[in-house]
Amino acid sequence: GTAGESEAAGFFGPELKMAGFDAIVFQGRSEKPVYLRVTGGKAEIKDATHISDLGAREVEDAIRDEMGSAKVRVAQTGLAGMNRVRFANITNNLGHFNGRNGFGALMGSKNLRAVAALGTEKLAFENLQFLRDTAREFTRTFKENPIGEQLFVYGTTAFAEILSAAGALPVNNFRRSSLDDAAPVS
């Protein structure tokens, strides 16, 4: 037992909220492969035996067909996760990945192939205009900053030199905290 975290971009989180959930806790292990369908404030465990050996795109297509909407957001582990490969990812909408801590393997250990969310509620914001203004300002500042541009183009590896110099670069699963020459990585 340990704790871990991982985050991914995309729209799965907002869709989960619009489906009526802030969070979901999974306990135990299913006897057979399953996926969780969440919509309209209800959660339903569905048999996933028919999709357990499919690739990610086929799984997403099958779940969307079953739920009757192309708007369904799917977070899933792949075959590596179902086989409990320790560094397996979770992908949502085939382009955003929770790659840290092997959470795909955690899903596989529970025989959980996917979580599918279809929102039916609108998100409510206390001050929507403030949120919009803040998002625009953040985006503008980010685009104008050369580091922000590097982050957009190269991802988090843009910070490899800075992190290495600070002794905060995770190398070999944190066995080391810097590289002798981080420049080629950045």
Roles of regions detected by a PLM:
Residues 1-7, 11-186:
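Intrinsically disordered, low-complexity segments enriched in small residues
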